[in-house]
Amino acid sequence: MQAACWYVLLLLQPTVYLVTCANLTNGGKSELLKSGGSKSTLKHIWTESSKDLSISRLLSQTFRGKENDTDLDLRYDTPEPYSEQDLWDWLRNSTDLQEPRPRAKRRPIVKTGKFKKMFGWGDFHSNIKTVKLNLLITGKIVDHGNGTFSVYFRHNSTGQGNVSVSLVPPTKIVEFDLAQQTVIDAKDSKSFNCRIEYEKVDKATKNTLCNYDPSKTCYQEQTQSHVSWLCSKPFKVICIYISFYSTDYKLVQKVCPDYNYHSDTPYFPSG
């Protein structure tokens, strides 16, 4: 003999609390445990994806066939079934909530200051034309990014003359005295550390028409040379010093590249 009592407590909140109590006789078991078990019934209920689940439906299927053991009358209204599109939308929304937040894209590491701008062959050139000489000098500067840089020169000349191309500090005085061209002050030598790394000179001779008199044939010498300097810090600014001497023409020129273009550190000349 068993007795079961059910109480429904209606509170102010829109939640229904269901309280059950059961008295079992000796050796007896709950009628709920005898009839199929709640585990399999609940599993069957929660796996139905085409019907809405409610507390009334859950209790009505769990206690089906047990009308004599309870005085609780639960009304069940047939829910409005979901469409297939609604189910797919629900699955998609639940999946989106479980996906981890995407990582912010990292910016690529850019090393600044390692490679500076370079002067190409077209950035520096010197073209000298006289009656007896045709001269073209081109150069470029390359910063290796490791504290050193190289200066390259190409020299092409046809005719007779004496050409000298060298690197000097900005304080080098422009003058025609040959003895002063290779002298560097002691204070400048500390901030000017350059040496010749490579040098090559090719010469050839040929007889061509003279520039001053096309009716005559003149002996002309063709010279092609390549030279490179390797400079290392500490240094401030280097200048290119060109001196040219011939029987009818004399030229001395000092060219200092725009160091503000070549380096991140501005250079302000003094003196």
UniProtKB/Swiss-Prot annotation:
One of its GO terms (cellular component) is extracellular region. Disulfide bonds: none annotated. It is found in: Secreted. Residues 1-21 form the signal peptide. May be proteolytically processed at the boundary between the N-terminal non-conserved and the central conserved domain in neuron-like cells. Residues 98-176 are annotated as: III. Its main location: secreted. Keywords: Glycoprotein, Secreted, Signal. Residues 177-185 are annotated as: IV (linker domain). GO terms for molecular function: signaling receptor binding. Residues 22-97 are annotated as: II. Residues 186-271 are annotated as: V (Cys-rich). Glycans are attached at N23, N68, N93, N146, N156, N162. Coiled coil: none annotated. InterPro entries: Nxph (IPR010450), NXPH/NXPE (IPR026845). May be signaling molecules that resemble neuropeptides. Ligand for alpha-neurexins. PANTHER family: NEUREXOPHILIN (PTHR17103), NEUREXOPHILIN-1 (PTHR17103:SF13). Belongs to the neurexophilin family. This is Neurexophilin-1.
